[in-house]
Amino acid sequence: MVTIRLARGGSKKRPFYHLTVTNSRNARDGRFVERIGFFNPVATGGEVRLSVDQERATYWLGQGAQPSERVAQLLKDAAKANA
């Protein structure tokens, strides 16, 4: 099954996540089909906290990709910010 989930990056004590489309059997930070955005939970100042390619996210959801709980909330937040 194809899922949209977060892949962790960044360094110790400073997380940074990529929103990735991947097979659910792949490792969290492993192989992916496409990166559709990023999430920076510790963004400060002028840094961007969330960026999502809405067009690609809509495409993958239309193809049957299942978002994780956190990604579903982030997609909702991104849609609200763009509206």
From Swiss-Prot:
Gene3D superfamilies tied to this protein: 3.30.1320.10
Q: Does the keyword Cytoplasm apply?
A: no
| InterPro entries the record matches | Ribosomal_bS16, Ribosomal_bS16_dom_sf
Keyword list, A-Z: Ribonucleoprotein, Ribosomal protein
* Tagged with keyword NADP: no
Q: Which Gene Ontology MF annotations are present?
A: structural constituent of ribosome
GO biological processes: translation
A GO CC annotation recorded here is: cytoplasm
- Domain of life of the native organism: Bacteria
Q: Which family does it belong to?
A: Belongs to the bacterial ribosomal protein bS16 family.
Quote the PANTHER family the UniProt record gives.
30S RIBOSOMAL PROTEIN S16, SMALL RIBOSOMAL SUBUNIT PROTEIN BS16M
Its name, as the record gives it, is Small ribosomal subunit protein bS16
Q: Which organism is it from?
A: Pseudomonas aeruginosa (strain ATCC 15692 / DSM 22644 / CIP 104116 / JCM 14847 / LMG 12228 / 1C / PRS 101 / PAO1)
- Gene field: rpsP
